[in-house]
Amino acid sequence: MLNVTDLRGHTPSKSDIRRALPRGGTDVVSVLPIVEPVVDDVQNRGAEAALDYGEKFDHIRPASVRVPAEVLKAAEDTLDPRVREAIEESIRRVRKVHADQKPREHTTELAPGGTVTERFLPIDRVGLYVPGGNAVYPSSVIMNAVPAQEAGVGTLVVASPPQADHGGWPHPTILAACSILGVDEVWAVGGAQAVALLAFGDDSADLEPVDIITGPGNIFVTAAKRLVRGVVGTDSEAGPTEIAILADDTANPVNVAYDLISQAEHDVMAASVLITDSEQLARDVNREIEARYAITRNADRVAEALRGKQSGIVLVDDIEVGIAVADQYAAEHLEVHTANAREVSERISNAGAIFVGDFSPVPLGDYSAGSNHVLPTSGTARFSAGLSTHTFLRPVNLIEYDEAALKDISEVVINFADAEDLPAHGEAIRARFETLPTTTADTTDTPDATA
């Protein structure tokens, strides 16, 4: 089922690897002309425009953008106890990890009386996007809200598409997760129009704009984020989900097959890639996939994803080359199924998250490992990171020098200012220690304004 790319027999360069690797991705640029008018319309008409687009795309118009408190409470009250237990345990684990991520204020002394203190200040108002679509994602509520809460964010807003099956409100499980987390501002709006409304708000509807928007979404959500970036902050652009598995002949082919299948279940564009130095493992995994995928509930979706150009098996000469291939692929999720898996994992430079060994599968990270599942995709893990407490914090420096400390460094500053031909910078320093000459304006030729 999976296509095979054979890199054996030579040492591939980085360029060779990037050209050879299966990669799908999404062409965000192609949908910008579709999304830009939506964003502009919501900026101009606010909530009314967002509701109009919801009616057009989601085939339902909620009674209001903001979900009433009683609807949130009812969703929590009627939640299946087993689902509630799962949500609460996942919140506990994710909160523990993200609480430990919060950096501490620190001060550096440059000279007696001269210090720089770095403080970490939370963003004031955050918009969290939770998609609808093929599945229900209360886990995305947890993964976005908990790090923001641990950062000390002032206000959280969750936006999620209205659903005709649920009275025009977002899915009840999403609403229940919001209620359990204490998020009481939830908007029944999805897609590009949700991103625009979060960015621009609507004073007439008492919908305040946010300062940053995070959370996954489809290509239209991603395009809208690109258009509003600069008006607000955003997290990294999320393409279709992906898994890479680096494995040798010690790997269990059944487990590897199931992990590839489970990621393909998300989306027909999802990518599932096996990187291995074992031709036997490659054959075994392909056989296990063929034998098992059809019994899953989402078999058609899985099959399309696994047969797509974005998925495949990459054969390499050895694990050394496998590590290089994994680094160039820079997977959203990377599993390592090798002898000495921890040692191999520590040599990986590029991945959104690394899952070490046979008992740390990606589905654990999707829900309850404690790590965050909002991760960079499409190779962007080479230069960006997943969502964390840091996403919602701004480092701010406090510079504090006394007179002696400034005088001690003043000559350096003045010389630098002169080198850059910015003499007023130097004079701003000198004026604190000496009386600088002034120019008295000659008013003899100035017209008398009262004449």
UniProtKB/Swiss-Prot annotation:
Its cofactor is Zn(2+). Gene3D superfamilies: 1.20.5.1300, Nitrogenase molybdenum iron protein domain (3.40.50.1980). It catalyses: L-histidinol + 2 NAD(+) + H2O = L-histidine + 2 NADH + 3 H(+). NAD(+) binds at Y129, Q193, N218. Substrate binds at T241, Q263, H266, H333, D366, E420, H425. Keywords: Amino-acid biosynthesis, Histidine biosynthesis, Metal-binding, NAD, Oxidoreductase, Zinc. The keyword Metal-binding applies. Residues 1-20 are annotated as: Disordered. Residues 7-19 have a biased composition (Basic and acidic residues). GO terms for cellular component: cytosol. Binds 1 zinc ion per subunit. It comes from the Bacteria. Catalyzes the sequential NAD-dependent oxidations of L-histidinol to L-histidinaldehyde and then to L-histidine. PANTHER family: HISTIDINE BIOSYNTHESIS TRIFUNCTIONAL PROTEIN (PTHR21256:SF2), HISTIDINOL DEHYDROGENASE HDH (PTHR21256). Belongs to the histidinol dehydrogenase family. This is Histidinol dehydrogenase.
